[in-house]
Design a protein with these regions (language model features):
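N-terminal leader segment of winged-helix/HTH proteins
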Residues: 1-10
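Intrinsic-disorder/low-complexity regions
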Residues: 1-2, 32, 95
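Short, Lys/Arg-enriched N-terminal segment that forms or immediately precedes the first helix
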Residues: 9-23
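Hydrophobic, proline/glycine-rich low-complexity stretches
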Residues: 11-12, 29, 33-35
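Winged helix-turn-helix DNA-binding recognition segment
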Residues: 19-29, 37-94
């Protein structure tokens, strides 16, 4: 099932599945999931480097958290190529 986030009537809320808190993930991975969900809920885009800039964790820490989410099935990563031939990753949050 693909992830769908819906906002309540107040746009300052992000809704995440309660299962994320019971999935046995690290606090880092859960926090990353919530940060990504917040950006996606308002229609934004985000990268690992932007997540690292937003938080005290470095890029290596962010990437390890993303790998943890991916391994647990909460995140799907696919590679894309832009019109200049550069590769980039696209992340999709999942509901488990």
């Amino acid at each position: 099932m693909n992830n769908t986030f819906e906002n309540g009537t107040d746009k300052d809320f992000t809704i995440v599945p309660n299962q994320i808190f019971k999935a046995g993930l690290s606090i880092k991975a859960v926090g990353l999931y919530m940060c990504i969900a917040e950006v996606l809920a308002r229609g934004g885009r985000i990268s690992a480097s932007v997540l690292a800039d937003m938080n005290k964790d470095g890029i290596a820490s962010i990437e390890s958290g993303l790998r943890e989410l991916e391994a647990a099935g909460w995140l799907r990563r696919s590679k894309k190529k832009d019109n200049k031939g550069h590769f980039y990753s696209v992340y999709e949050l999942r509901n488990n």
